[in-house]
């Protein structure tokens, strides 16, 4: 019986992009199902008292430099040569996160990948409705219709509810994954997830 890997997801996180590709490989190897749960990382930080690593660790001499080294190693290991840090990072992802809630299941997984490519490879501004609509249309979606759907009050509330529910489950950052009730934080935990799925 196929098991599900739930990705607590916000495309504002560079680690969400970096984790995505080896996670897809893991899903293919194990036959698991990938589910994406959109949240707002900023809201999660406010609810937990957490902060982005580059802010939180700035007071520790050498820590951010080492984190950058580890990121480069991860990029090299997984061949993530299309990764580009957007010039406007950090940015608001309210719009793309709401976009993800306009679809479900496999369609949401596909849309998440499209958004990651647009933001982290092509540099499309995540907070620019016109630019996002254009990128979505180019990828085969009805970009204007999807953008319009994000204004549904139910979509807006669902994003808030998802964020609060994730924190209630113990989440404090991105990327977080669940397999059943087992929580894993960080792209470095993908091996542990695969071991659990194989067990």
Residue ranges and their predicted role:
Residues 3-6, 10-33, 37, 105, ...:
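C-terminal cap of thioredoxin/glutaredoxin-like
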Residues 18-119:
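Structural alpha/beta surface segment adjacent to cysteine/selenocysteine redox centers
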């Amino acid at each position: 019986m196929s098991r599900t890997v739930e990705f607590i997801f916000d495309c504002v996180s560079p680690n969400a992009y970096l984790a995505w590709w080896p996670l897809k490989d893991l899903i293919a190897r194990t036959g698991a199902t990938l589910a994406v749960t959109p949240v707002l990382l900023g809201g999660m930080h406010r609810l937990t008292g957490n902060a982005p690593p580059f802010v939180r660790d700035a007071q520790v001499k050498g820590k951010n430099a080492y984190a950058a080294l580890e990121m480069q190693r991860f990029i090299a290991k997984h061949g993530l040569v299309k990764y580009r840090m957007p010039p406007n990072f950090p940015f608001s992802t309210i719009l793309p996160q709401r976009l993800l809630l306009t679809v479900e299941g496999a369609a949401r997984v596909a849309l998440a990948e499209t958004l990651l490519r647009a933001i982290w490879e092509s540099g499309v501004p995540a907070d620019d409705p016109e630019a996002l609509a254009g990128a979505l249309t180019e990828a085969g979606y009805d970009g204007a219709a999807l953008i319009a759907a994000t204004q549904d009050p139910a979509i807006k509330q669902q994003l808030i509810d998802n964020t609060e529910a994730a924190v209630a489950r113990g989440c404090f950052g991105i990327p977080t994954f669940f397999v059943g009730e087992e929580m894993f934080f960080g792209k470095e935990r993908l091996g542990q997830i695969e071991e659990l799925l194989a067990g």
